A protein has these predicted regions:
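Long, contiguous binding/interaction regions
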Residues: 2-77, 81-195
Length: 195
């Protein structure tokens, strides 16, 4: 089993203040950039499918999508991660605002924001691998949440870059199963998404 010592200090992966610097947000392919769009919408049947249908009909790609009720049970908050130029994201925002169920749309990447994603990963952990997998979990501030004689299941949270770095650091042959939630984001400071 070989491990790539990608980063022994997780602060090198996740900025200390949880911000994603502007120069690390860009994919820089013809001005394409990763955007996190936060949508407040009515919590009713069919609302999610109409938003996804809008993206599909116009050929926009959704990298990740999370949705859950808010503190107001009549509203849900949807977080969409998509890649596109500023013009494309502006068009997406305009189209989203036209949907009757949509209450408010904000591109979080226009200001300071905090982003988190959850990953559960089941790894083969036998013999000498067990201690190495535990060490890797500790380095990335993960938690071992399930243990068997042959496996560890590790919970990791952070931005997408941190989770990707963990996947690169462990031996691919040791990865048995992975599930990720997709990004959730919230504006920093006084920025609040409310009606």
């Amino acid at each position: 089993m070989s491990f790539t010592p990608l980063a022994l200090n997780p602060d090198a992966i996740v900025p200390q203040n949880d911000r994603i610097p502007a120069n690390r947000r860009s994919y820089d392919e013809k001005n394409s950039m990763r955007h996190i769009i936060s949508v407040l919408l009515e919590n009713e049947p069919g609302a999610l499918s109409r938003v996804v249908g809008l993206f599909s009909a116009r050929g926009y790609n959704i990298e990740t999508l999370t949705v859950a009720p808010t503190e107001d049970p009549s509203l849900s908050r949807m977080t969409i991660v998509s890649v596109g130029s500023d013009d494309v994201i502006e068009q997406i925002t305009k189209h989203l605002n036209r949907l009757i169920e949509v209450v408010k749309v904000v591109d979080l990447t226009e200001g300071d924001f905090t982003e988190r994603e959850l990953m559960l990963i089941k790894l083969r952990a036998v013999g000498k691998e067990r201690e190495e997998m535990k060490r890797m979990a500790d380095i990335f501030r993960g938690r071992i949440i399930d243990v068997t004689e042959r496996t560890y299941t590790i919970e990791l949270t952070g931005n997408a870059g941190k989770l990707d770095a963990f996947l690169q650091a462990v031996d691919r042959a040791a990865i048995l199963e992975t599930v990720r939630t997709g990004s959730s984001g919230i504006g920093r400071g006084e920025r609040i998404l409310r009606v």
